[in-house]
Amino acid sequence: MAKAKFERTKPHVNIGTIGHVDHGKTTTTAAITLVLSKVGKASFKKYDEIDAAPEERERGITINTAHVEYETDNRHYAHVDCPGHADYIKNMITGAAQMDGAILVVSAADGPMPQTREHILLARQVGVPYIVVWLNKADMVDDPELMELVEMEVRELLSSYEFPGDDIPIVAGSGLKALECGCGKRECEWCGKIWALMDEVDKYIPTPERATDKPFLMPVEDVFTITGRGTVATGRVERGTIKVGEEVEIVGLAESTRKTVVTGVEMFRKLLDFAQAGDNIGTLLRGVERKDIERGQVLAKPGSIKPHTKFTAEVYVLSKEEGGRHTPFFNGYRPQFYFRTTDVTGFIELPEGVEMCMPGDNIKMTIELGKTIAIEEGLRFAIREGGRTVGAGVVTGIIE
């Protein structure tokens, strides 16, 4: 997945369109790029260009995703749109496209449908924190009372999944009419509605906390000893910053969490005073012996993450075509769970009344690991069998 560099003069936010098939997610995405292109803040992407999304592979799973980017006066946006329903599920579970917020597209003519519900549930489960609603196809509804009913229904549905349904902004319009008009003016009946939508997205979806502002965490990839100096753990800083002299905890795979002090930070063979999210570093750890630390543990800001063995997760099971299992698995299935840098054996408990899980399914399950791992809600993992990926999951709740 090539990530293009862009000029970072404005805060950056990742969003996406979600909602039921044929309610107009891609048309809406195209309309946003058209309207913003009129003021030089986007390049117009036609429906067909977005719909013919390239295949990407994320953790061995094939996902079709279209990426468009555009700006408003206040922000730079990266926007994902998926052609197929299954692509959304895979995207949200693998975190291939992390969303800081989503535009939920609901056809005003049809109201909420099964996939509307499923996408809201997934957004809740995988931690998409904010939703703005676009009631599309408003040109097909003449009765204002009907519009009000659909709006009420959407608000109730959002509230039932613990989103603040009463406060969520809802904008009604028509992506198709905005595309047909194409003037891009704020005072236009249809293009103006796209502006109203983007104004709400700007206002309602907060700028995410930057990775560097979060508590320090570095998954340990490798460990070695430097004679006369001590033990060095290497890895890529996932979030936060670390300064020489700061205290960290070594979390996971051990009976207890131990504290140590980082006495040196090195990157590209140069000594640094500090490192931040994204840096590949070596950390020299005071008083830690080679046997006290291993790949699969994390170095973290004390108290910021705990070791756990049991949790709930939302999981996508790879289909046979994706190189997954050819047969279903049952309660008590014991694969490997790959967290950050290592595999840990564990077993799966399926929900009550569910006998088995078929390749291609997505399912909520409880997982118990044989060893502790530094786990928190929102952490992504892979399920593997003999070294090949058979599933992808995200932690939705900690049990113990």
Swiss-Prot record:
Region of interest (G1), ranges: 19-26
Top EC class, one word: hydrolase
Keywords, in A-Z order: Cytoplasm, Elongation factor, GTP-binding, Hydrolase, Magnesium, Metal-binding, Nucleotide-binding, Protein biosynthesis
Start and end residues of each stretch annotated as G2: 60-64
Region (G4): 136-139
One GO cellular component, as annotated: cytosol
Cystine crosslinks: none
Superkingdom of origin organism: Bacteria
Residues annotated to bind Mg(2+): T26
Protein name as it appears in the record: Elongation factor Tu
